[in-house]
Protein backbone atom coordinates (compact mmCIF):
# COMPACT_ATOMS: atom_id res chain seq x y z
CA UNK A 1 0.00 0.00 0.00
CA UNK A 2 1.57 3.29 -1.05
CA UNK A 3 1.47 6.56 0.82
CA UNK A 4 0.40 8.42 -2.33
CA UNK A 5 -2.71 6.31 -2.63
CA UNK A 6 -3.76 7.07 0.92
CA UNK A 7 -3.24 10.81 0.58
CA UNK A 8 -5.03 10.96 -2.77
CA UNK A 9 -8.00 9.11 -1.32
CA UNK A 10 -8.12 11.53 1.57
CA UNK A 11 -8.06 14.52 -0.80
CA UNK A 12 -10.89 13.06 -2.89
CA UNK A 13 -13.08 12.57 0.16
CA UNK A 14 -12.23 16.00 1.54
CA UNK A 15 -13.18 17.61 -1.80
CA UNK A 16 -16.43 15.67 -1.81
CA UNK A 17 -17.11 16.87 1.71
CA UNK A 18 -16.45 20.51 0.82
CA UNK A 19 -18.75 20.35 -2.22
CA UNK A 20 -21.43 18.61 -0.19
CA UNK A 21 -21.20 21.11 2.65
CA UNK A 22 -21.56 23.98 0.15
CA UNK A 23 -24.67 22.37 -1.26
CA UNK A 24 -26.09 21.82 2.22
CA UNK A 25 -25.54 25.47 3.14
CA UNK A 26 -27.24 26.59 -0.08
CA UNK A 27 -30.15 24.26 0.60
CA UNK A 28 -30.50 25.51 4.18
CA UNK A 29 -30.58 29.14 3.04
CA UNK A 30 -33.25 28.51 0.40
CA UNK A 31 -35.30 25.90 2.24
CA UNK A 32 -38.08 28.30 3.20
CA UNK A 33 -38.37 29.90 -0.26
CA UNK A 34 -37.62 27.14 -2.79
CA UNK A 35 -39.61 23.91 -2.97
CA UNK A 36 -37.51 20.72 -3.18
CA UNK A 37 -38.00 18.47 -6.19
CA UNK A 38 -38.77 14.87 -5.30
CA UNK A 39 -36.25 13.29 -7.68
CA UNK A 40 -33.50 15.80 -7.00
CA UNK A 41 -32.28 14.42 -3.69
CA UNK A 42 -32.43 10.65 -3.97
CA UNK A 43 -29.52 8.92 -5.69
CA UNK A 44 -27.69 12.12 -6.65
CA UNK A 45 -26.58 13.57 -3.36
CA UNK A 46 -25.02 11.88 -0.37
CA UNK A 47 -26.95 12.20 2.85
CA UNK A 48 -25.32 13.84 5.85
CA UNK A 49 -25.19 10.54 7.72
CA UNK A 50 -23.36 8.84 4.83
CA UNK A 51 -20.94 11.73 4.54
CA UNK A 52 -20.31 11.62 8.31
CA UNK A 53 -19.44 7.92 8.11
CA UNK A 54 -17.01 8.51 5.23
CA UNK A 55 -15.41 11.44 7.04
CA UNK A 56 -15.12 9.35 10.22
CA UNK A 57 -13.40 6.54 8.34
CA UNK A 58 -10.90 8.94 6.76
CA UNK A 59 -9.71 10.12 10.18
CA UNK A 60 -7.82 6.91 10.71
CA UNK A 61 -4.87 7.13 8.37
CA UNK A 62 -2.82 3.97 8.75
CA UNK A 63 0.77 5.21 8.67
CA UNK A 64 0.98 8.93 9.24
CA UNK A 65 2.21 8.82 12.85
CA UNK A 66 4.42 5.76 12.75
CA UNK A 67 8.03 5.45 11.74
CA UNK A 68 7.67 1.96 10.28
CA UNK A 69 5.35 1.08 7.42
CA UNK A 70 1.91 0.78 8.99
CA UNK A 71 -0.52 -0.97 6.67
CA UNK A 72 -3.79 -2.58 7.66
CA UNK A 73 -1.71 -5.13 9.56
CA UNK A 74 -0.34 -2.81 12.24
CA UNK A 75 -1.47 -0.04 14.59
CA UNK A 76 -3.82 2.66 13.38
CA UNK A 77 -3.73 6.27 14.40
CA UNK A 78 -6.26 7.67 16.83
CA UNK A 79 -7.88 10.90 15.63
CA UNK A 80 -6.21 13.91 17.19
CA UNK A 81 -8.39 15.52 19.83
CA UNK A 82 -8.05 19.28 19.90
CA UNK A 83 -9.02 20.78 23.24
CA UNK A 84 -10.61 24.20 22.94
CA UNK A 85 -10.23 27.02 25.41
CA UNK A 86 -13.89 26.68 26.36
CA UNK A 87 -13.40 23.03 27.33
CA UNK A 88 -10.37 23.94 29.46
CA UNK A 89 -12.34 26.68 31.22
CA UNK A 90 -15.24 24.32 31.81
CA UNK A 91 -12.88 21.70 33.28
CA UNK A 92 -11.38 24.33 35.61
CA UNK A 93 -14.84 25.38 36.80
CA UNK A 94 -15.81 21.76 37.50
CA UNK A 95 -12.61 21.09 39.43
CA UNK A 96 -13.13 24.23 41.52
CA UNK A 97 -16.66 23.17 42.42
CA UNK A 98 -15.43 19.87 43.79
CA UNK A 99 -13.04 21.48 46.30
CA UNK A 100 -14.60 22.53 49.60
CA UNK A 101 -13.87 25.92 51.20
CA UNK A 102 -11.89 24.35 54.07
CA UNK A 103 -9.63 22.54 51.63
CA UNK A 104 -9.10 25.76 49.68
CA UNK A 105 -8.03 27.64 52.82
CA UNK A 106 -5.57 24.88 53.80
CA UNK A 107 -4.18 24.76 50.28
CA UNK A 108 -3.70 28.55 50.17
CA UNK A 109 -1.77 28.53 53.48
CA UNK A 110 0.70 25.86 52.36
CA UNK A 111 0.76 26.67 48.66
CA UNK A 112 3.76 27.40 46.52
CA UNK A 113 4.30 28.21 42.89
CA UNK A 114 6.27 26.15 40.45
CA UNK A 115 7.76 27.91 37.46
CA UNK A 116 6.58 26.69 34.09
CA UNK A 117 9.25 25.30 31.82
CA UNK A 118 9.25 25.40 28.05
CA UNK A 119 9.92 21.73 27.52
CA UNK A 120 10.66 19.28 30.34
CA UNK A 121 13.88 17.37 29.87
CA UNK A 122 12.14 14.08 30.54
CA UNK A 123 9.78 14.39 27.56
CA UNK A 124 10.70 11.83 24.97
CA UNK A 125 11.62 12.65 21.42
CA UNK A 126 8.58 13.15 19.30
CA UNK A 127 6.57 15.19 21.82
CA UNK A 128 6.88 18.41 19.83
CA UNK A 129 3.75 19.07 17.84
CA UNK A 130 5.49 21.46 15.45
CA UNK A 131 8.27 19.07 14.47
CA UNK A 132 8.22 17.46 11.06
CA UNK A 133 9.22 14.20 12.65
CA UNK A 134 6.17 14.02 14.90
CA UNK A 135 4.13 12.13 12.36
CA UNK A 136 6.77 9.43 12.23
CA UNK A 137 7.02 8.83 15.97
CA UNK A 138 4.87 6.69 18.23
CA UNK A 139 1.61 8.12 19.54
CA UNK A 140 2.31 6.57 22.93
CA UNK A 141 5.46 8.64 23.42
CA UNK A 142 3.53 11.78 22.52
CA UNK A 143 0.81 11.05 25.05
CA UNK A 144 3.24 10.19 27.83
CA UNK A 145 5.28 13.31 27.04
CA UNK A 146 2.21 15.53 27.29
CA UNK A 147 1.18 14.00 30.61
CA UNK A 148 4.60 14.63 32.11
CA UNK A 149 4.67 18.18 30.78
CA UNK A 150 1.27 18.92 32.32
CA UNK A 151 2.24 17.44 35.68
CA UNK A 152 5.30 19.71 35.89
CA UNK A 153 3.70 22.90 34.59
CA UNK A 154 0.59 23.01 36.80
CA UNK A 155 -0.15 26.25 38.64
CA UNK A 156 -0.51 26.24 42.44
CA UNK A 157 -0.18 23.07 44.45
CA UNK A 158 0.26 22.38 48.12
CA UNK A 159 3.81 22.13 49.46
CA UNK A 160 3.41 18.42 50.21
CA UNK A 161 1.97 17.68 46.78
CA UNK A 162 4.66 19.82 45.16
CA UNK A 163 7.48 17.89 46.80
CA UNK A 164 5.85 14.59 45.91
CA UNK A 165 5.34 15.61 42.29
CA UNK A 166 8.93 16.85 42.03
CA UNK A 167 10.25 13.57 43.44
CA UNK A 168 8.07 11.62 41.03
CA UNK A 169 9.23 13.75 38.11
CA UNK A 170 12.88 13.22 39.11
CA UNK A 171 12.26 9.47 39.24
CA UNK A 172 10.69 9.54 35.82
CA UNK A 173 13.48 11.70 34.48
CA UNK A 174 16.16 9.36 35.76
CA UNK A 175 14.40 6.28 34.40
CA UNK A 176 13.60 7.78 30.99
CA UNK A 177 16.79 9.78 30.52
CA UNK A 178 18.49 6.92 28.67
CA UNK A 179 15.40 5.95 26.67
CA UNK A 180 15.01 7.97 23.48
CA UNK A 181 14.27 5.59 20.60
CA UNK A 182 13.09 2.66 22.71
CA UNK A 183 9.93 3.08 24.79
CA UNK A 184 9.09 1.87 28.29
CA UNK A 185 12.46 0.32 29.11
CA UNK A 186 11.37 -0.30 32.73
CA UNK A 187 9.20 -3.28 31.70
CA UNK A 188 11.51 -6.28 31.39
CA UNK A 189 11.22 -9.74 29.94
CA UNK A 190 10.75 -12.54 32.49
CA UNK A 191 14.32 -13.41 33.55
CA UNK A 192 15.71 -16.67 32.25
CA UNK A 193 19.36 -17.76 32.43
CA UNK A 194 19.62 -18.81 28.79
CA UNK A 195 18.44 -15.62 27.04
CA UNK A 196 21.92 -14.89 25.62
CA UNK A 197 23.99 -17.52 23.82
CA UNK A 198 27.42 -16.91 25.35
CA UNK A 199 29.01 -19.71 23.29
CA UNK A 200 28.00 -17.99 20.06
CA UNK A 201 29.01 -14.57 21.38
CA UNK A 202 32.52 -15.71 22.34
CA UNK A 203 33.43 -16.46 18.70
CA UNK A 204 33.51 -13.29 16.53
CA UNK A 205 33.42 -15.31 13.29
CA UNK A 206 30.52 -17.60 14.24
CA UNK A 207 27.83 -15.57 12.46
CA UNK A 208 27.32 -17.01 8.98
CA UNK A 209 23.61 -16.36 8.34
CA UNK A 210 22.30 -14.02 5.68
CA UNK A 211 20.19 -10.99 6.60
CA UNK A 212 17.40 -9.61 4.43
CA UNK A 213 18.76 -6.27 3.26
CA UNK A 214 16.86 -3.00 3.45
CA UNK A 215 17.69 -2.47 -0.25
CA UNK A 216 14.15 -3.65 -1.01
CA UNK A 217 12.89 -0.30 0.28
CA UNK A 218 15.26 1.75 -1.92
CA UNK A 219 15.02 2.74 -5.59
CA UNK A 220 17.69 1.35 -7.92
CA UNK A 221 19.36 4.72 -8.50
CA UNK A 222 19.78 5.21 -4.73
CA UNK A 223 21.58 1.92 -4.02
CA UNK A 224 25.00 3.58 -4.38
CA UNK A 225 24.13 5.96 -1.51
CA UNK A 226 23.69 3.20 1.08
CA UNK A 227 25.76 3.42 4.28
CA UNK A 228 26.69 0.54 6.56
CA UNK A 229 25.94 0.17 10.27
CA UNK A 230 28.03 -2.36 12.20
CA UNK A 231 26.76 -4.70 14.90
CA UNK A 232 28.46 -4.83 18.28
CA UNK A 233 28.88 -8.61 18.53
CA UNK A 234 30.07 -9.03 14.96
CA UNK A 235 31.74 -5.80 13.75
CA UNK A 236 32.52 -7.48 10.45
CA UNK A 237 28.80 -7.61 9.67
CA UNK A 238 27.29 -4.42 8.25
CA UNK A 239 23.67 -3.70 7.40
CA UNK A 240 23.26 -1.07 4.70
CA UNK A 241 20.69 1.71 4.97
CA UNK A 242 19.78 4.75 2.95
CA UNK A 243 20.21 7.35 5.69
CA UNK A 244 17.50 9.74 4.64
CA UNK A 245 14.55 11.15 6.56
CA UNK A 246 12.17 10.81 3.64
CA UNK A 247 9.78 7.87 3.67
CA UNK A 248 10.88 5.05 1.36
CA UNK A 249 9.01 2.17 -0.27
CA UNK A 250 6.16 0.63 1.74
CA UNK A 251 6.28 3.69 4.03
CA UNK A 252 9.61 2.57 5.51
CA UNK A 253 11.83 5.00 7.44
CA UNK A 254 15.22 3.54 8.45
CA UNK A 255 16.29 6.25 10.91
CA UNK A 256 14.24 5.07 13.93
CA UNK A 257 15.29 1.48 13.29
CA UNK A 258 18.95 2.54 13.32
CA UNK A 259 18.33 4.54 16.50
CA UNK A 260 16.65 1.61 18.24
CA UNK A 261 19.44 -0.72 17.20
CA UNK A 262 22.18 1.57 18.54
CA UNK A 263 20.30 2.34 21.76
CA UNK A 264 19.70 -1.39 22.35
CA UNK A 265 23.40 -2.08 21.94
CA UNK A 266 24.32 0.67 24.40
CA UNK A 267 21.70 -0.40 26.92
CA UNK A 268 22.37 -4.15 26.93
CA UNK A 269 25.77 -4.90 25.40
CA UNK A 270 28.04 -1.97 26.30
CA UNK A 271 30.26 -2.56 29.37
CA UNK A 272 29.82 0.05 32.12
CA UNK A 273 33.09 1.80 31.21
CA UNK A 274 31.77 2.55 27.72
CA UNK A 275 28.12 3.32 28.53
CA UNK A 276 28.66 7.08 28.97
CA UNK A 277 30.15 7.45 25.50
CA UNK A 278 27.36 5.33 24.05
CA UNK A 279 24.62 7.37 25.73
CA UNK A 280 26.14 10.60 24.40
CA UNK A 281 26.02 9.14 20.89
CA UNK A 282 22.36 8.14 21.34
CA UNK A 283 21.42 11.65 22.50
CA UNK A 284 23.25 13.22 19.54
CA UNK A 285 21.58 10.74 17.21
CA UNK A 286 18.16 11.64 18.60
CA UNK A 287 18.83 15.38 18.17
CA UNK A 288 19.83 14.85 14.54
CA UNK A 289 16.72 12.72 14.03
CA UNK A 290 14.43 15.43 15.42
CA UNK A 291 16.05 18.08 13.21
CA UNK A 292 15.87 15.77 10.16
CA UNK A 293 19.61 16.41 9.76
CA UNK A 294 20.63 13.45 7.61
CA UNK A 295 24.30 14.41 7.36
CA UNK A 296 24.75 14.66 11.13
CA UNK A 297 22.85 11.40 11.58
CA UNK A 298 25.20 9.66 9.14
CA UNK A 299 28.32 11.02 10.88
CA UNK A 300 27.10 9.77 14.27
CA UNK A 301 26.46 6.29 12.84
CA UNK A 302 30.05 6.24 11.56
CA UNK A 303 31.28 7.32 15.02
CA UNK A 304 29.30 4.43 16.52
CA UNK A 305 30.96 2.03 14.07
CA UNK A 306 34.38 3.24 15.20
CA UNK A 307 33.44 3.07 18.90
CA UNK A 308 32.25 -0.55 18.93
CA UNK A 309 35.45 -1.62 17.17
CA UNK A 310 37.43 -0.46 20.23
CA UNK A 311 35.40 -2.35 22.87
CA UNK A 312 37.17 -5.53 24.08
CA UNK A 313 35.09 -8.60 23.33
CA UNK A 314 35.76 -10.23 26.71
CA UNK A 315 34.10 -7.26 28.47
CA UNK A 316 30.99 -7.67 26.31
CA UNK A 317 30.82 -11.42 27.05
CA UNK A 318 31.30 -10.77 30.77
CA UNK A 319 28.50 -8.17 30.74
CA UNK A 320 26.05 -10.54 29.01
CA UNK A 321 27.02 -13.43 31.29
CA UNK A 322 25.62 -11.44 34.23
CA UNK A 323 22.11 -11.75 32.68
CA UNK A 324 21.20 -8.05 32.39
CA UNK A 325 17.53 -7.04 32.41
CA UNK A 326 16.12 -7.19 28.89
CA UNK A 327 13.40 -4.60 28.13
CA UNK A 328 10.25 -5.84 26.43
CA UNK A 329 10.65 -2.96 23.96
CA UNK A 330 13.92 -4.50 22.72
CA UNK A 331 12.12 -7.78 21.97
CA UNK A 332 9.32 -5.90 20.21
CA UNK A 333 11.90 -3.96 18.18
CA UNK A 334 13.50 -7.21 17.07
CA UNK A 335 10.11 -8.72 16.17
CA UNK A 336 9.14 -5.58 14.27
CA UNK A 337 12.37 -5.60 12.27
CA UNK A 338 11.76 -9.21 11.19
CA UNK A 339 8.13 -8.39 10.39
CA UNK A 340 9.20 -5.45 8.25
CA UNK A 341 11.65 -7.52 6.20
CA UNK A 342 9.48 -10.61 5.76
CA UNK A 343 5.88 -9.37 5.62
CA UNK A 344 5.66 -5.84 4.23
CA UNK A 345 6.80 -6.56 0.68
CA UNK A 346 4.11 -9.27 0.39
CA UNK A 347 1.37 -7.78 2.59
CA UNK A 348 -1.14 -7.39 -0.25
CA UNK A 349 -1.36 -11.16 -0.64
CA UNK A 350 -2.94 -11.39 2.81
CA UNK A 351 -5.96 -9.44 1.56
CA UNK A 352 -6.98 -12.18 -0.83
CA UNK A 353 -9.77 -13.91 1.07
CA UNK A 354 -13.56 -14.11 1.07
CA UNK A 355 -15.08 -11.44 3.29
CA UNK A 356 -16.69 -12.63 6.54
CA UNK A 357 -15.39 -16.16 6.02
CA UNK A 358 -13.24 -18.32 8.28
CA UNK A 359 -10.22 -17.23 6.23
CA UNK A 360 -10.40 -13.52 7.06
CA UNK A 361 -6.93 -12.40 8.14
CA UNK A 362 -6.28 -10.28 11.22
CA UNK A 363 -3.48 -9.88 13.75
CA UNK A 364 -3.13 -9.32 17.47
CA UNK A 365 -0.72 -6.55 18.46
CA UNK A 366 2.54 -7.28 20.37
CA UNK A 367 1.64 -5.06 23.35
CA UNK A 368 -1.68 -6.87 23.80
CA UNK A 369 -0.01 -10.27 23.52
CA UNK A 370 2.49 -9.30 26.23
CA UNK A 371 -0.40 -8.45 28.57
CA UNK A 372 -2.48 -11.55 27.90
CA UNK A 373 0.48 -13.96 27.97
CA UNK A 374 1.45 -12.62 31.39
CA UNK A 375 -2.12 -13.11 32.62
CA UNK A 376 -1.89 -16.75 31.55
CA UNK A 377 1.44 -17.24 33.32
CA UNK A 378 3.34 -18.18 30.17
CA UNK A 379 6.96 -19.10 30.99
CA UNK A 380 9.96 -21.15 29.91
CA UNK A 381 8.28 -24.41 31.00
CA UNK A 382 5.12 -23.81 28.96
CA UNK A 383 3.99 -25.27 25.64
CA UNK A 384 2.14 -22.67 23.56
CA UNK A 385 -0.18 -23.34 20.62
CA UNK A 386 -1.82 -20.97 18.14
CA UNK A 387 -4.60 -22.43 16.00
CA UNK A 388 -4.78 -20.16 12.97
CA UNK A 389 -1.32 -18.64 13.43
CA UNK A 390 -1.27 -16.51 10.26
CA UNK A 391 2.25 -15.22 9.57
CA UNK A 392 3.40 -16.55 12.95
CA UNK A 393 3.55 -13.34 15.01
CA UNK A 394 2.06 -14.82 18.19
CA UNK A 395 4.15 -17.98 17.96
CA UNK A 396 7.51 -16.25 17.61
CA UNK A 397 6.66 -13.67 20.30
CA UNK A 398 5.75 -16.41 22.79
CA UNK A 399 9.07 -18.08 22.02
CA UNK A 400 11.36 -15.03 22.06
CA UNK A 401 9.75 -13.00 24.85
CA UNK A 402 8.65 -15.79 27.21
CA UNK A 403 11.09 -18.55 26.23
CA UNK A 404 8.44 -21.27 25.88
CA UNK A 405 9.63 -24.86 25.87
CA UNK A 406 7.81 -25.19 22.54
CA UNK A 407 5.83 -22.68 20.49
CA UNK A 408 3.58 -24.23 17.85
CA UNK A 409 1.40 -22.69 15.16
CA UNK A 410 -1.03 -24.11 12.61
CA UNK A 411 -2.10 -22.18 9.48
CA UNK A 412 -4.11 -23.23 6.43
CA UNK A 413 -3.68 -20.22 4.07
CA UNK A 414 -0.85 -20.57 1.52
CA UNK A 415 0.18 -16.90 1.47
CA UNK A 416 0.31 -16.58 5.25
CA UNK A 417 2.22 -19.87 5.50
CA UNK A 418 4.85 -18.64 3.03
CA UNK A 419 5.35 -15.47 5.07
CA UNK A 420 5.54 -17.40 8.34
CA UNK A 421 8.48 -19.35 6.91
CA UNK A 422 10.19 -16.14 5.77
CA UNK A 423 9.66 -14.48 9.13
CA UNK A 424 10.98 -17.46 11.10
CA UNK A 425 14.10 -17.60 8.91
CA UNK A 426 14.72 -13.87 9.43
CA UNK A 427 14.15 -14.18 13.17
CA UNK A 428 16.70 -16.98 13.50
CA UNK A 429 19.30 -14.91 11.64
CA UNK A 430 18.74 -11.80 13.72
CA UNK A 431 18.73 -13.72 17.00
CA UNK A 432 22.17 -15.06 16.08
CA UNK A 433 23.25 -11.53 15.15
CA UNK A 434 22.28 -10.29 18.64
CA UNK A 435 23.56 -13.44 20.39
CA UNK A 436 20.10 -14.55 21.58
CA UNK A 437 18.97 -18.12 22.24
CA UNK A 438 15.75 -18.83 20.35
CA UNK A 439 13.70 -21.65 21.93
CA UNK A 440 12.11 -24.30 19.66
CA UNK A 441 9.42 -23.15 17.22
CA UNK A 442 7.30 -25.53 15.15
CA UNK A 443 4.67 -24.89 12.46
CA UNK A 444 2.08 -27.04 10.73
CA UNK A 445 1.61 -24.95 7.58
CA UNK A 446 -0.88 -25.17 4.72
CA UNK A 447 -2.98 -27.51 6.88
CA UNK A 448 -6.14 -27.09 8.93
CA UNK A 449 -6.10 -27.74 12.66
CA UNK A 450 -9.14 -29.97 12.10
CA UNK A 451 -8.07 -33.65 12.02
CA UNK A 452 -4.43 -32.55 12.27
CA UNK A 453 -2.20 -35.28 13.68
CA UNK A 454 0.41 -32.86 15.09
CA UNK A 455 -2.30 -30.79 16.82
CA UNK A 456 -3.86 -33.92 18.28
CA UNK A 457 -0.44 -34.95 19.60
CA UNK A 458 0.34 -31.62 21.33
CA UNK A 459 -3.09 -30.77 22.78
CA UNK A 460 -2.72 -32.98 25.92
CA UNK A 461 0.64 -31.31 26.72
CA UNK A 462 -0.43 -27.73 25.93
CA UNK A 463 -0.40 -25.09 28.70
CA UNK A 464 -1.70 -22.04 26.78
CA UNK A 465 -3.63 -22.15 23.51
CA UNK A 466 -4.64 -19.12 21.43
CA UNK A 467 -7.68 -19.26 19.15
CA UNK A 468 -8.54 -16.05 17.30
CA UNK A 469 -12.18 -17.01 16.73
CA UNK A 470 -13.45 -13.47 16.22
CA UNK A 471 -15.21 -14.35 12.97
CA UNK A 472 -15.47 -18.17 13.09
CA UNK A 473 -18.79 -19.61 11.90
CA UNK A 474 -20.84 -22.20 13.81
CA UNK A 475 -19.44 -25.32 12.07
CA UNK A 476 -15.83 -24.25 12.71
CA UNK A 477 -16.62 -23.40 16.34
CA UNK A 478 -17.99 -26.93 16.66
CA UNK A 479 -14.67 -28.26 15.35
CA UNK A 480 -12.81 -26.08 17.87
CA UNK A 481 -14.90 -27.68 20.62
CA UNK A 482 -13.75 -31.11 19.47
CA UNK A 483 -10.08 -30.06 19.29
CA UNK A 484 -9.90 -28.64 22.84
CA UNK A 485 -11.51 -31.70 24.47
CA UNK A 486 -8.09 -33.18 25.23
CA UNK A 487 -6.67 -30.20 27.15
CA UNK A 488 -5.29 -30.99 30.60
CA UNK A 489 -6.49 -29.38 33.84
CA UNK A 490 -4.88 -26.00 34.42
CA UNK A 491 -4.38 -25.16 30.75
CA UNK A 492 -5.72 -21.84 29.48
CA UNK A 493 -7.52 -20.85 26.29
CA UNK A 494 -7.21 -17.29 24.93
CA UNK A 495 -9.97 -16.21 22.54
CA UNK A 496 -11.76 -13.10 21.28
CA UNK A 497 -15.14 -14.80 21.57
CA UNK A 498 -16.07 -17.10 24.42
CA UNK A 499 -15.22 -20.70 23.60
CA UNK A 500 -18.22 -21.84 25.62
CA UNK A 501 -21.43 -20.49 24.02
CA UNK A 502 -23.48 -17.94 26.00
CA UNK A 503 -26.35 -19.59 27.87
CA UNK A 504 -24.60 -22.96 27.85
CA UNK A 505 -26.33 -25.54 30.04
CA UNK A 506 -24.88 -28.81 31.19
CA UNK A 507 -25.72 -31.90 29.18
CA UNK A 508 -26.05 -34.78 31.64
CA UNK A 509 -25.63 -37.26 28.80
CA UNK A 510 -22.21 -35.74 28.04
CA UNK A 511 -20.68 -35.11 31.46
CA UNK A 512 -17.11 -35.43 30.17
CA UNK A 513 -17.45 -32.43 27.84
CA UNK A 514 -14.67 -29.93 28.60
CA UNK A 515 -17.17 -27.06 28.45
CA UNK A 516 -18.53 -28.30 31.80
CA UNK A 517 -15.09 -27.73 33.36
CA UNK A 518 -14.25 -24.33 31.86
CA UNK A 519 -13.96 -21.29 34.11
CA UNK A 520 -14.44 -18.39 31.68
CA UNK A 521 -13.19 -14.89 32.51
CA UNK A 522 -13.77 -11.85 30.30
CA UNK A 523 -11.51 -8.80 30.12
CA UNK A 524 -11.87 -5.48 28.37
CA UNK A 525 -9.89 -5.46 25.15
CA UNK A 526 -7.53 -2.43 25.23
CA UNK A 527 -7.24 -0.03 22.33
CA UNK A 528 -4.68 -0.85 19.63
CA UNK A 529 -4.94 -4.56 20.39
CA UNK A 530 -5.98 -5.79 16.95
CA UNK A 531 -4.89 -4.96 13.41
CA UNK A 532 -8.30 -4.17 11.91
CA UNK A 533 -9.11 -1.24 14.20
CA UNK A 534 -7.44 0.86 16.89
CA UNK A 535 -10.65 0.83 18.94
CA UNK A 536 -11.58 -1.58 21.67
CA UNK A 537 -13.80 -4.14 19.94
CA UNK A 538 -15.33 -5.59 23.08
CA UNK A 539 -13.88 -8.24 25.38
CA UNK A 540 -11.38 -11.03 25.17
CA UNK A 541 -11.67 -14.26 27.14
CA UNK A 542 -9.34 -16.49 29.13
CA UNK A 543 -10.86 -19.89 29.86
CA UNK A 544 -9.19 -22.13 32.45
CA UNK A 545 -9.71 -25.90 32.42
CA UNK A 546 -10.75 -27.10 35.90
CA UNK A 547 -10.54 -30.51 37.56
CA UNK A 548 -14.25 -30.45 38.45
CA UNK A 549 -17.42 -29.03 36.93
CA UNK A 550 -17.61 -25.24 36.87
CA UNK A 551 -20.37 -24.19 39.27
CA UNK A 552 -21.21 -21.06 37.30
CA UNK A 553 -23.03 -23.09 34.62
CA UNK A 554 -25.70 -23.88 37.20
CA UNK A 555 -26.41 -20.17 37.76
CA UNK A 556 -29.81 -19.19 36.28
CA UNK A 557 -28.60 -15.86 34.80
CA UNK A 558 -25.93 -17.79 32.90
CA UNK A 559 -28.56 -20.17 31.54
CA UNK A 560 -30.52 -17.21 30.27
CA UNK A 561 -33.86 -18.65 31.45
CA UNK A 562 -34.64 -16.13 34.16
CA UNK A 563 -34.71 -12.46 33.37
CA UNK A 564 -33.17 -9.94 35.68
CA UNK A 565 -35.76 -8.84 38.24
CA UNK A 566 -35.86 -5.09 38.57
CA UNK A 567 -37.64 -3.30 41.39
CA UNK A 568 -40.69 -1.34 40.27
CA UNK A 569 -40.57 2.33 41.10
CA UNK A 570 -43.87 4.15 41.54
CA UNK A 571 -44.05 7.82 40.65
CA UNK A 572 -46.83 10.32 40.86
From Swiss-Prot:
Ubiquitination of histone H2B to form H2BK123ub1 is required for efficient DOT1 methyltransferase activity on histone H3. Residues 245-558 form the DOT1 domain. It is found in: Nucleus. It catalyses: L-lysyl(79)-[histone H3] + 3 S-adenosyl-L-methionine = N(6),N(6),N(6)-trimethyl-L-lysyl(79)-[histone H3] + 3 S-adenosyl-L-homocysteine + 3 H(+). Keywords: Chromatin regulator, Methyltransferase, Nucleus, Repeat, S-adenosyl-L-methionine, Transcription, Transcription regulation, Transferase. Its EC number is 2.1.1.360. Signal peptide: none annotated. It comes from the Eukaryota. GO terms for cellular component: chromosome, telomeric region; nucleosome; nucleus. Residues 1-48, 75-173 are annotated as: Disordered. Its main location: nucleus. GO terms for molecular function: histone binding; histone H3K79 trimethyltransferase activity. In contrast to other lysine histone methyltransferases, it does not contain a SET domain, suggesting the existence of another mechanism for methylation of lysine residues of histones. This is Histone-lysine N-methyltransferase, H3 lysine-79 specific. It comes from Kluyveromyces lactis (strain ATCC 8585 / CBS 2359 / DSM 70799 / NBRC 1267 / NRRL Y-1140 / WM37) (Yeast).
